[in-house]
């Protein structure tokens, strides 16, 4: 009897405790976000708070393509980590993993705080099978903010179907050194254009329940020498009116919940430890209410690259006290607990950072977020409407630079043959931050022309040369092809890597800066050789950045810039 009474009392206590936990204020969606944040923050241990400021790489908790719960438990030690990324995962694998991790965080940790599942989606989700839209520089060339909104609305739907709640885009840098490899990621060199496109893209994400992260804050688009990690040198007036004007506009008008700090510096002061940028400007002057996230490894760079910190602990102090709330792909914030316990860091900075992260999670509905179902995946990812939108953007992004004697459009009924020549004539170029570089995942210009002309006329193709080598052995074939054709289309340009997959022969994109702006390899020599045949020539620039083509401008009657046009580019 006593045993029965004891068990009954234990059951009652458990039920009372469970009822109390499920009725915590932070779990009540009807309460103001501020109340929910403060209630949850008051219940968190120091370890739990710091975990919210850190992230997990998917590959570190997976085995044979699936979640290894033992690895996850060992890594997080029962704490709710704030973020997880799975950038290189195939789409359905990403959905499965993100759902499993999200469910684990909600159901098997003490407070059940959901995780921000994040990925890249600069011009489409980077997970296999997603729609590949035109690169940002192409979208900017449409001068159409409506298309910018429609594009991120479509991307957000695909991300949600893949279990993603936080996108590491859009890029709203103002690019003014065209040697920089990341020009392709930007909308352009005008702050007004970049601002309008940025506002539209942020709204497209937010209206479709995905949190965007504007980047790279701040002054990242004009590094010295065009080198990706180099400092940006400019006065405060130029900084505010050019490079940061886009961030001010987007923060005030579109109200994103996340900003990524860049890993470079302004006038040799690292952005990752700039109190002026992240606190005085972003929060005090512009009233930003969300959190600041570091670029990949940027906090550690304060130690080994910028040399402002002697070790990772100093780097953590510099970044956090300046206003950098969350750390990506580094372990500097693992030092925070010991720094607090040793009296070297006031815990108020941690509370402040965690409150901002939780504010974003509550506002984005993560605590009430239903896990996406796999049955919806194929209906959403690479949907026909998204593919059609990608084509529409590609069409509007084309720029006609030169059209002497109205050589364009071609009078197809007057032609018997067309020569299609060049290293990019039969090769897709999607741009950086994509999941593929393979022709099977897009339409090349040559393929599209074959479909367009059918049996109406003859297409003669020759590659001519590569993008980067000095090999001219293909010139003879290209010249022969040109001689037997009525008109020649020569497709030159650049190539970019696909994110974390294939970096071969890249001449553009992150980490692939150029020392000058002439076409790489012997591409211009190829154009000259084709021009020497006396046949009419049209040059198509299929690239992620502008190039200096003085000879081509002076001698070729038709010049078209296509940029990186996405999967429907042909």
Residues covered by each model-derived region:
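Bacterial Sec-dependent N-terminal signal peptides
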Residues: 1-23
């Amino acid at each position: 009897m006593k045993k029965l009474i004891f068990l009954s009392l234990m059951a009652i206590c458990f039920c009372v405790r469970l009822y109390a936990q499920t009725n915590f204020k932070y779990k009540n969606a009807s309460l103001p976000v501020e109340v929910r944040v403060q209630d949850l923050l008051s219940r968190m241990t120091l370890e739990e708070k710091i975990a919210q400021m850190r992230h997990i790489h998917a590959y570190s908790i997976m085995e044979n393509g699936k979640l290894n719960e033992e690895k996850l438990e060992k890594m997080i030690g029962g704490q709710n980590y704030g973020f997880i990324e799975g950038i290189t995962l195939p789409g359905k694998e990403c959905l499965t993993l993100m759902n499993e991790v999200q469910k684990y965080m909600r159901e098997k940790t003490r407070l059940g705080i959901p995780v921000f599942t994040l990925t890249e989606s600069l011009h489409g989700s980077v997970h296999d099978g997603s729609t590949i839209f035109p690169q940002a520089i192409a979208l900017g060339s449409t001068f159409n903010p409506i298309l910018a909104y429609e594009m991120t609305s479509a991307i957000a739907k695909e991300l949600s179907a893949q279990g993603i709640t936080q996108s590491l885009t859009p890029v709203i840098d103002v690019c003014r050194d065209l040697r920089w490899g990341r020009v392709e990621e930007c909308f352009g060199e005008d702050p007004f254009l970049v601002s309008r496109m940025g506002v539209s893209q942020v709204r497209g994400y937010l209206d479709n329940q995905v949190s965007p992260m504007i980047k790279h804050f701040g002054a990242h688009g004009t590094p010295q020498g065009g080198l990706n990690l180099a400092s940006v040198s400019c006065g405060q007036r130029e900084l505010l009116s050019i490079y940061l004007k886009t961030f001010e506009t987007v923060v005030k008008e579109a109200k994103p919940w996340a900003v990524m700090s860049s890993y470079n510096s302004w006038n040799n002061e690292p952005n990752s430890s700039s109190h002026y940028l992240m606190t005085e400007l972003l929060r005090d002057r512009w009233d930003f209410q969300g959190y600041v996230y570091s670029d990949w490894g940027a906090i550690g760079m304060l130690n080994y690259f910028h040399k402002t910190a002697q070790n990772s602990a100093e780097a953590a102090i510099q970044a956090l006290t300046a206003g950098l709330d969350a750390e990506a792909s580094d372990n500097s914030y693992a030092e925070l607990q010991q720094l607090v316990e040793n009296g070297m860091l006031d815990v108020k900075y941690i509370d402040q950072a965690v409150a901002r992260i939780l504010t974003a999670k509550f506002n984005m509905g993560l605590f009430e977020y239903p896990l996406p179902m796999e049955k919806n995946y194929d209906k959403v990812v690479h949907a026909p409407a998204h593919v059609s939108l990608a084509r529409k953007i590609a069409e509007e992004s084309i720029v006609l630079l030169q059209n002497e004697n109205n050589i364009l459009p071609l009078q197809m009924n007057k032609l018997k043959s067309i020569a299609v020549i060049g290293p990019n004539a039969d090769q897709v170029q999607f741009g950086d931050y994509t999941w593929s570089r393979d022709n099977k995942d897009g339409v090349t210009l040559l393929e599209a022309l074959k479909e367009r002309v059918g049996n109406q006329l003859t297409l003669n193709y020759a590659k001519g040369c590569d993008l980067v080598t000095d090999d001219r052995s293909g010139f003879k074939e290209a010249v022969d092809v040109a001689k037997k054709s009525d008109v020649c289309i020569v497709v030159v340009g650049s190539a970019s890597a696909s994110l974390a997959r294939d970096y071969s022969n890249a001449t553009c994109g992150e980490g692939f800066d150029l020392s000058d702006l002439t076409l790489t390899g012997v591409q211009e020599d190829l154009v000259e050789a084709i021009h020497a045949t006396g046949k009419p020539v049209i040059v198509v620039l299929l690239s992620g950045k502008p190039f200096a083509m003085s000879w081509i401008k002076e001698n070729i009657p038709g010049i078209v810039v296509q940029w990186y046009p996405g999967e429907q580019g042909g």
